[in-house]
């Protein structure tokens, strides 16, 4: 029973059309589950339909909490609007211009999607690291299943951004998907995952990657807070405690993305920006006596904290090798970067313990052995050897194998569980915060991907030395 012209589609194919009134029709289909769409065109002053089936029951196309309704509605659209079945049916996209989304048969009752999975389809910095390690592991072992998992994860994040931005505009506040990308106030929110996204696109190919790459690239290059010399720092943050600070790990949150954005766009300015960041951070965070980096510089006190957090230091040299791999040989900052890399690696080498590990507080071996920073030093040392950046490479080869033995002994069990990865950090001028309060988590996503990357680098180093 319809009011006005009505068209019924089953799995995107038109099966029935009427100009209104009560009618019946048959649709013979093999056993299975099918999507049913009804296009209802306003007839006079009213529209609507009733669709009943004698042989099967309808069920909702999505699990919508709080209702038993089986029909959802979307519209209104102009009469000649071509409905995008492929994108609208997955319920990941807004539809039309102006945009709208699915709703129930009640006034202003829109359906609002949620991603309740903490590890799949999520966009955050630790998962960016995890997927990066997983990608190169999948390539190394030739696993199509893992490649497909990574691609599906990242593609879901790309596909839902447009909806998430609309969701925030409609309802305000944090969105139930992409709450970081829709409320960016730091490099943490965008740089790590976007860098990994571009790496996945390079190897596996993704749809519509440019719109997200441009969105993140614009924030990092044009909107992220900078000092007068162009160095990134934290200002006007949601977490006010972070205001007016500079964090060592922000080199990872920015530089790899700038590197890949330069490759993606062909624009040299991103590489120049990446190179300059290291010297701005060095000016504020470098601890020359030990040749390592302080975790944070607090501009409110015009002082660095002088606490060398392990993972923060790991991110510095990790990111430097990402840049040096693609920085042109004639770049004016290249030689200075290589010299800085050698200086830092000398400092880190001196702080390796007898079991091969580096510690949560690098210069305090009474703090716990920390897996993610140990993995990053393996990664940076190996790349420094393979690309010829490190002087006296023999001592670093020895340190790498010693560290990998330490990780194999204490950090990874026979089931692949990863131990000893520090959880997400705040900062302090007091080393005891890192030593006693900032503990580690089992299988923490801040470190699982890094352990995989370290393992890949050990394999690459073996091949390099054999040749």
Residue locations for each model-derived region?
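Active-site lining segments of carbohydrate-active enzymes
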Residues: 92-96, 114-118, 236, 241-245, ...
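CBM-like carbohydrate-recognition segments
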Residues: 95-105, 118-124, 140, 156-211, ...
């Amino acid at each position: 029973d319809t009011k006005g012209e009505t068209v019924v589609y089953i799995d995107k194919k038109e099966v029935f059309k009427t100009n209104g009134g009560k009618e019946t029709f048959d649709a013979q289909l093999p056993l299975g589950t099918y999507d049913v769409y009804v296009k209802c065109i306003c007839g006079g002053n009213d529209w609507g339909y009733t669709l009943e089936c004698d042989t099967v029951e309808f069920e909702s196309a999505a699990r919508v909490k709080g209702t038993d309704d089986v029909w959802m509605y979307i519209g209104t659209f102009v009469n000649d609007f071509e409905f995008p079945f492929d994108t609208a049916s997955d319920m990941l996209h807004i539809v039309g211009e102006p945009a709208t989304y699915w709703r129930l048969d009640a006034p202003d009752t829109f359906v609002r999607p949620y991603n309740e999975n903490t590890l799949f389809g999520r966009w955050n910095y630790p998962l960016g690291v995890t997927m990066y390690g997983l990608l190169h592991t999948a390539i190394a072992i030739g696993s199509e299943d893992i490649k497909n998992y990574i691609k599906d994860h990242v593609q879901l994040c790309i596909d839902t951004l447009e909806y998430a931005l609309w969701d925030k505009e409609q309802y305000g506040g944090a969105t139930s998907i992409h709450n970081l990308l829709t409320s960016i106030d730091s490099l943490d929110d965008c740089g790590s995952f976007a860098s990994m996204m571009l790496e996945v696109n390079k190897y596996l190919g993704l749809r519509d990657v440019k719109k997200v790459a441009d969105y993140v690239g614009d924030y990092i290059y044009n909107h992220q807070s900078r000092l007068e010399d162009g160095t990134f720092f934290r200002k006007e943050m949601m977490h006010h405690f972070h205001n007016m600070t500079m964090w060592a790990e922000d080199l990872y949150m920015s530089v790899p993305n700038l590197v890949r954005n330069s490759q993606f766009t062909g624009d040299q300015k991103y590489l120049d920006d990446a190179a300059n960041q290291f010297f701005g951070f060095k000016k504020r965070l470098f601890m020359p006596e030990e040749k390592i980096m302080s975790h944070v510089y607090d501009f409110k006190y015009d002082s660095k904290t002088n606490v060398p957090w392990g993972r923060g230091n790991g991110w510095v040299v990790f990111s430097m090798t990402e840049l040096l791999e693609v920085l042109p040989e004639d770049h004016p900052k290249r030689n200075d970067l290589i010299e800085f890399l050698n200086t830092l690696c000398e400092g880190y080498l001196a702080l390796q313990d007898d079991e091969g590990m580096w510690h949560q507080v690098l210069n305090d071996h009474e703090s716990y052995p920390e897996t993610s920073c140990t993995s990053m030093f393996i990664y940076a040392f190996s790349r420094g050897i393979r690309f010829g950046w490190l002087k006296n490479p023999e001592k670093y080869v020895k340190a790498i194998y010693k560290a990998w033995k330490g990780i194999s002994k204490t950090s990874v069990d026979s089931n692949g569980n990863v131990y000893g990865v520090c959880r997400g950090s705040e900062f302090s001028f007091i080393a005891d915060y890192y030593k006693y309060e900032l503990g580690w988590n089992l299988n923490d996503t801040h470190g699982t991907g890094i352990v995989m990357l370290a393992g890949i680098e050990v394999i690459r180093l073996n091949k390099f030395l054999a040749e």
